[in-house]
Amino acid sequence: MTTSSYFLLVALGLLLYVCRSSFGSEHTCESDASPHPQGVCGSPLAEAVEAACELEQSLQGGTGKKRGRASLLRKRRAFLSMLKARAKRNEASPLQRSGRGIVCECCKNHCNIEELTEYCPPVTEGSG
């Protein structure tokens, strides 16, 4: 093996290691995993996501009009109730679609505020 081929192989291995370690922090779950002692599950999880989304909205400036703000909150609440129903349906199903999701990240593992805000629905000011 020539020196340049060896260098390329080492560089590729290092790149794969860096990519794997940066994505390795993702939570994965088994279907029968028990909740984390500091995990948030059920209705408190939906409330935590709602609070995180409202906090993110207020930090980003929100909307200038009260009516628009109320409409955005209604849309977010509808989205969060749909998310909660979907989580219940997926937990009841023996064949889950994937090992990741809000229940996996925040109930069966412990999640932080950034992970909670990943589940906020995209809401634009003009969609009211």
From Swiss-Prot:
GO terms for biological process: glucose metabolic process. The modification Serine amide is found at S127. One of its GO terms (cellular component) is extracellular region. The keyword Disulfide bond applies. The keyword Nucleotidyltransferase does not apply. Keywords: Amidation, Carbohydrate metabolism, Cleavage on pair of basic residues, Disulfide bond, Gamma-carboxyglutamic acid, Glucose metabolism, Hormone, Secreted, Signal, Toxin. Heterodimer of A and B chains; disulfide-linked. This is Con-Ins F2c. It comes from Conus floridulus (Cone snail).
